[in-house]
UniProtKB/Swiss-Prot annotation:
Keyword Ubl conjugation: no
PROSITE patterns noted in UniProt: RRM, ZF_C3H1
InterPro entries, per database record: Cwc2/Slt11 (IPR039171), Nucleotide-bd_a/b_plait_sf (IPR012677), RBD_domain_sf (IPR035979), RRM_dom (IPR000504), STL11/RBM22-like_N (IPR048995), Torus (IPR032297), Znf_CCCH (IPR000571), Znf_CCCH_sf (IPR036855)
PANTHER family, sorted: PRE-MRNA-SPLICING FACTOR RBM22
Origin species: Oryza sativa subsp. japonica
Protein name per its UniProtKB record: Zinc finger CCCH domain-containing protein 40
Chain spans, region Disordered: 329-482
Positions of C3H1-type zinc fingers: 157-184
GO molecular function, one term: zinc ion binding
Domain annotation RRM: ranges: 228-301
One term under GO cellular component: Prp19 complex
Keyword annotations of the record: DNA-binding, Metal-binding, RNA-binding, Zinc, Zinc-finger
């Protein structure tokens, strides 16, 4: 690389770009990202050539990330410049090449001179508009890729690194430490090399994914030959009925498609059992529609299970403690009058006997706990149902009739204290006011009448009034003459 320092940087072929080639997981979930761009800041960890480095923070709780390889090496393998995973499927290079049967180990040279010449040759073809022969090509994804591909971004990969001082027990920052206070993971996945990831050799993550693909179970058809329905789970508003029809129609004729958006699932029913088995075999563990991985299972019949008499009776009076006694006894007995001419015949049980189906509005009167007279302190008829008052009410009626008063008896006192008060069942209720006798009523006020002697004396003392025939003469006026 020493001879390159004497030449013009613009004609050298080094990378100069305005935006990196990265995956959605490394970019982060924040739509507003501030990036730092530095030309020729680092050398590529694959070809050792200077390139433009981009640095940014993908999220609030994430660490700063930067590009690790140049765009030339990135385009040769179709991988991200940061995590070196496939841009289309999100898988390591070794998993992708193994699934697509691509042998790219010998396609890219590893020596310094040959690798530099190989990169410059591809850059020249790219500037000339020639589609250079990349190692990955454009192949159709097979079953292994469809099973293992990542359909949604994985932002957990952008978390901060583990604090090394915390591992040694010497971190004094506490909650202000920008690194994670966790113990590091040990095992095969902790030893990873960037060159092994790029070339697809001895990658522990790829080996784990390939082993997982071989252990995935397949859908076993049920023994019941009448089942022709497949269950699809994990739906959202983006997937429509037409999308499901386009995906499943290639395996057989579809009888019906029922979507249950409240449960985020759907049921696809085929006209034949062979079509359902073929769809379950070809789409098991690899059903992806509009980039969303869906769950595929065999449907189960929903046959009603009849209950015995005792279980049905218990379910029918499950809320018996909240109803009046008359209603409870009527439900428990189940004795309903039969129409004339039907005595002694067994009636068919109604639908509510087997299923707890609520009655339609207005069919019967709704009973609430507040309507129970036994919990409101009201007068309750005797249990015989003859309408006679109880013993306490009869005693109070006899006492009121003997005294001749219509108001109840005054409150009694026990040893100078009020009788103990117990709150009613179901919550607090203020005690009722004790009735007292009303104050005595007096007749309305009338003025006192005078006796005959007093009336004669008063009339003699008062002068007689002038009559109409007597002229009232004014008193004479005295005049003086000068």
């Amino acid at each position: 690389m020493a001879h390159r320092l004497l030449r013009d940087a613009q004609a050298d072929g080094w990378e100069r770009s305005d935006f990196p080639i990265i995956c959605e997981s490394c970019l982060g979930d924040n739509p507003y990202v501030r990036m730092l761009r530095a030309e020729y800041d680092k050398e590529c960890k694959i070809c050792a050539r200077p390139f433009t480095v981009f640095r940014w923070r993908p999220g609030r709780d994430a660490r700063y990330k930067k590009t690790e390889i140049c765009q030339t090496c990135c385009k040769l393998k179709n991988v991200c410049q940061v995590c070196l995973l496939d841009l289309e499927y999100g898988l390591p290079v070794q998993v992708r090449d193994t699934a697509l049967a691509i042998n790219s180990n010998d396609a890219i040279p590893r020596s310094d001179v040959n690798r530099e010449y190989f990169a410059e040759e591809h850059d020249r073809k790219a500037r000339a508009g020639i589609d250079y022969d990349s190692s990955h090509g454009k192949a159709r994804p097979n079953d292994t890729i469809l099973k293992l591909q990542r359909t949604a971004p994985y932002y957990k990969r952008n978390r901060a690194h583990v604090c090394s001082f915390y591992v040694r027990g010497e971190c004094t920052r506490g909650a202000e430490c920008p690194y994670r206070h966790e113990m590091p993971e040990t095992g095969e996945l902790s030893q990873q090399n960037i060159k092994d990831r790029y070339y697809g050799v001895n990658d522990p993550v790829a080996l784990k994914l390939l082993g997982k693909a071989g252990e995935m179970p397949s859908l076993t058809p049920p023994d019941d030959e009448s089942i022709r329905t497949l269950y699809i789970g994990g739906l959202n508003n983006r997937i429509t009925e037409q999308d499901l029809r386009d995906q499943f129609y290639a395996h057989g004729e579809i009888e019906s498609i029922r979507m249950v958006l409240q449960r985020a699932c759907a049921f696809v029913t085929y006209t034949t059992r062979e079509g359902a088995e073929k769809a379950a075999e070809e789409l098991a563990n690899k059903l992806v529609i509009k980039g969303i991985r869906l769950k595929l299972m065999w449907g189960k019949p929903q046959a009603p299970k009849p209950e015995d008499d005792e279980a049905g009776r218990q379910g029918h009076v499950a809320h018996g403690g909240m109803l009046p006694r008359a209603v409870i006894s009527q439900q428990q007995s189940g004795d309903q009058p039969q129409p004339p001419g039907m005595e002694g015949q067994q009636q068919a049980p109604s639908g509510s006997y087997y299923f707890n189906i609520p009655a339609p509005p207005g069919a019967e009167r709704t009973l609430y706990p507040s309507m129970d007279p036994q919990r409101m302190g009201a007068l309750v008829k005797s249990q015989e149902g003859d309408g006679k008052p109880g013993p306490q009410q009869a005693a109070q009626a006899q006492a009121s009739s003997s005294s001749g008063q219509s108001y109840p008896m005054p409150p009694q006192y026990y040893h100078g204290q009020y009788p103990p008060y117990y709150p009613p069942y179901g919550g607090y209720m203020p005690p009722p006011r004790m009735p007292y006798p009303p104050p005595p009523q007096y007749p309305p006020y009338q003025p006192m009448l005078a006796t005959p002697a007093q009336s004669q004396a008063s009339s003699s003392q008062q002068p007689a009034p002038a009559t109409l025939h007597q002229a009232q003469v004014p008193p004479p006026q005295q005049t003086t003459q000068n």
